[in-house]
Every structure is written in structure tokens, then in C-alpha cells.
Amino acid sequence: MAGTKEIRTKIKSVQNTRKITKAMEMVAASKMRKAQERMRSARPYAEKVRNIAAHLATANPEFKHPFMQEREVKRVGMIVVTTDKGLCGGLNTNVLRAVTNELKTLQGRGVDVQATAIGTKGMQFLGRVGAKVISHVVHLGDTPHLEKLIGAIKVQLDAFTNGEVDAVYLAYTKFINTMKQEPMVEQLLPLAADKLVQTEEEKRAYSWDYIYEPDAQTVVEELLVRYVEALVYQAVAENMASEQSARMVAMKAASDNAKNVIGELQLVYNKTRQAAITKELSEIVSGAAAV
């Protein structure tokens, strides 16, 4: 059995670790609230752009944007959104497992895949599995900015427009609530008509039209690009909210475990100290009896 000095050292070490995890838990909780607010703030913009794009697409059926043209799928682009840092539980593991399953399915059908990595963990994963990475962006920080994402996203959008890929998928972690985050792999392009016009009521509402300057086609082309960019930004915002929630939960679990370990070590320390005192008393009594 370890001596009291060694046990005290272990207790001190675990206490120091608990201070770190507790501080990280509090920081993650603060960042989580900001990330959730950022995520909620991004939704109205994406929804408004969708409404306008849907109105244009419905009122002008003669024009079909390249983003809405379906082709036989032989090549696929995949945008993989992960975190830059670890210590967030199984968040990255879960979304990368979903990506792995999707890659196996696509490759099993003879489909070539080229990827875009958003986040260091995804970049490292794609490098390990030997995936073809055509663009990437890392170190986004706690506040993602669309201008930093656009370059990497545009590579995939241009590849789709030019016919280099026939579909683009988006993999990220969807924020459900503080305790639950769900890995998602969704088709980003081509845009399905029912994704723009989601209800019959919307379809009827969009049957009338505006007068556009310079023309409807130019407006649609610009709006759909902005809409797809907004979808990717929303996915990044959701992923960041999920990251901070998962990190807060993971650090709380680590702090609770450290507290339990400290309690167990304290019990062992007390027993060891009691045994040492009992032994000393026995030796004193034995010595006195011998005299």
C-alpha cells in the first residue's frame, strides 16, 4: 500500500486537474450561450433568402439555375465541418463516423469523392484516410466569419457549376439541445425544389411576381449562391454550438469524476494514516510493557 505522502501527492494532483476541468466547464458554458445566440441569429437570414429565392424560382419556371440541375452522380464533393480543438466528448468521432459510412457507400457505387475540410480535426481525418482534399479552412476561432469560409466553399460550388462534381454533401453536427447533438450528412447541391418551396401555401403565395432590376435571372443567380453560403454558415454555427455544449458536458463529467477520485483517495489516506498511528501506538505499548 502507498504511504501517506504518495497519497497526498495524488490527491493534490487530482485537485489541480479538477480546477482545470472546472474552469474549462465554466468557459465552455459562457461560449455555448454566445454560440447558441449566433446560431439563432443566422437562421432568419437563411430563411429570408430561401423565401425570396423560392419566390423567384416559382414565378420564373423558365429559368433553372445550375444549382438546381440534377445529373447522374459519378463524382461527389463533400464539405466536412468539425472542430479545431478536442476535449469535446465524442462530437468529432460521431460526425466522422457518419462521413466514413457515407464515403464507403459512395465508393461502393464507384463514385469519386473530393472533400473540403472546415476544422482541424476534419482536415487531419481526411488526410489519414487518404481522401482528396481540394480546399480547407481551419482556425476559425470562437466567432466564424462568412468571408473566411467563402473561399473554401466556392471551390466546391464552382466544381458543381462546371460539372466537375455532380452533387455536394454537407457533414456537420446539428445542435438539438445542450445534452444532445446529432451528426448529419445532407445533400447541399443540387438544391431540391421542395427545399425551396416547402408547402403548397408557399407555392400559391409565390405564383405572382415582382419587377426585377436588372432582371430575374441575375437576381436568382446571386441569391442562390448566397443561400447555399448561408446554409454552410448555419451548419458551422450549429457545429460550434454543439462543440461548446459537448465540451461543457465533458468537462463537467471530468470534474465530477475527479471529485469522486479525490473522495476515494481521501478514504485510502485516512485508512493508511490510521494504520500507521495504530502501529506506532502498539510499538509504544509493547516498549512500555517490556520495561
Swiss-Prot record:
Domain of life: Bacteria
Principal cellular location given in the protein's record: membrane
Role summary: Produces ATP from ADP in the presence of a proton gradient across the membrane. The gamma chain is believed to be important in regulating ATPase activity and the flow of protons through the CF(0) complex.
UniProt similarity note: Belongs to the ATPase gamma chain family.
Protein name, per record: ATP synthase gamma chain
Any Pfam family hit: ATP-synt
Keywords, comma-separated and alphabetical: ATP synthesis, Cell inner membrane, Cell membrane, CF(1), Hydrogen ion transport, Ion transport, Membrane, Transport
GO molecular function, one term: proton-transporting ATP synthase activity, rotational mechanism
HAMAP family, per the entry: ATP_synth_gamma_bact (MF_00815)
Organism classification: Bacteria, Pseudomonadati, Pseudomonadota, Betaproteobacteria, Burkholderiales
Compartment(s): Cell inner membrane
Disulfide bonds, paired cysteine numbers: none
Gene that encodes the chain: atpG
InterPro entries: ATP_synth_F1_ATPase_gsu, ATP_synth_F1_gsu, ATP_synth_F1_gsu_CS
Quaternary organization: F-type ATPases have 2 components, CF(1) - the catalytic core - and CF(0) - the membrane proton channel. CF(1) has five subunits: alpha(3), beta(3), gamma(1), delta(1), epsilon(1). CF(0) has three main subunits: a, b and c.
